[in-house]
């Protein structure tokens, strides 16, 4: 009994430590996104002044920041994953190796940080639109246009189990494998009652595991971005409706 209590205590401390580390990383991620937004605004001003070389330098710097953004995101996800899977054992646990292995695996997943492509595209579109508003950027095809500056990298807009919009979830989590988003309590209950279950999103074959359904470092930022986009869309619809009414009069 004492041994079990001690093990629970160790696991609890590991979880608490992971929360602190992820929180610190989240602050870094937020700072990077703010820096990228600021650099985008500066690049737009430089493009207006036809200072192409400086714009290119800024784009290269943004690319470097987004690489750091990706690494921070992977580190946070790796920390959460290792903490969730941790089971106390008699021999010493090599946490550095566990974290490094998880980080390497995450970094090898091509779609694990889609928001980086989204942020870079936003930067390039803002610069392009200075002199070419309304024109497609060079190299754009139908697939490229799908990811526009008015879209968010969230794969699903509603929780497949609760039916709630992702923007209204009280405690959102995301599968590390298929990247779909759910309400935490609902998906964990689903996993308990359906061992070895697939993701409940129609057509998705992603496997569900407790340890791989987490609130990763970027999820809350993406949900907040979606809320902002929804507000902008609603304002645009109101303006359009008002304009139509005026035209009819």
Swiss-Prot record:
What subcellular compartments does it reside in? Answer: Nucleus; Cytoplasm
Q: Which InterPro entries match?
A: Nse2(Mms21), Znf_MIZ, Znf_RING/FYVE/PHD
The record ties this protein, via PROSITE patterns, to: ZF_SP_RING
Zn finger (SP-RING-type) start-end: 141-228
Q: Pfam families this protein is in? A: zf-Nse
Which E.C. number(s) belong to this protein?
A: 2.3.2.-
Q: Which residues carry this modification: N-acetylalanine?
A: 2
Query: What CDD domains does UniProt report for this protein, alphabetically?
Result: SPL-RING_NSE2 (cd16651)
Ordered alphabetically, the record's keywords are: Acetylation, Cell cycle, Cytokinin signaling pathway, Cytoplasm, Metal-binding, Nucleus, Transferase, Ubl conjugation, Ubl conjugation pathway, Zinc, Zinc-finger
Query: From what superkingdom does this record's organism come?
Result: Eukaryota
Annotated GO biological process = cytokinin-activated signaling pathway; DNA damage response; double-strand break repair via homologous recombination; germ-line stem-cell niche homeostasis; negative regulation of DNA endoreduplication; positive regulation of cell population proliferation; positive regulation of cytokinin-activated signaling pathway; positive regulation of mitotic cell cycle
Record GO terms (molecular function): SUMO transferase activity; zinc ion binding
One GO location term (cellular component): nucleus
Is Membrane given among the entry's keywords?
Answer: no
List of residues binding Zn(2+): 178, 180, 199, 204
Q: How does it assemble?
A: Interacts with SCE1.
Protein task: E3 SUMO-protein ligase that modulates cell cycle progression and functions as a repressor of endocycle onset in meristems. May function downstream of the meristem patterning transcription factors PLETHORA 1 and 2 (PLT1 and PLT2) in root meristem development. Modulates the expression of the mitotic cyclins CYCB1-1 and CYCB1-2 and cyclin-dependent kinases CDKB1-1 and CDKB2-1 in root meristem. Involved in cytokinin signaling in root development.
Official protein name in the record: E3 SUMO-protein ligase MMS21
Give the species this sequence originates from: Arabidopsis thaliana (Mouse-ear cress)
Give the organism's phylogenetic lineage. Answer: Eukaryota, Viridiplantae, Streptophyta, Embryophyta, Tracheophyta
Gene name?
MMS21
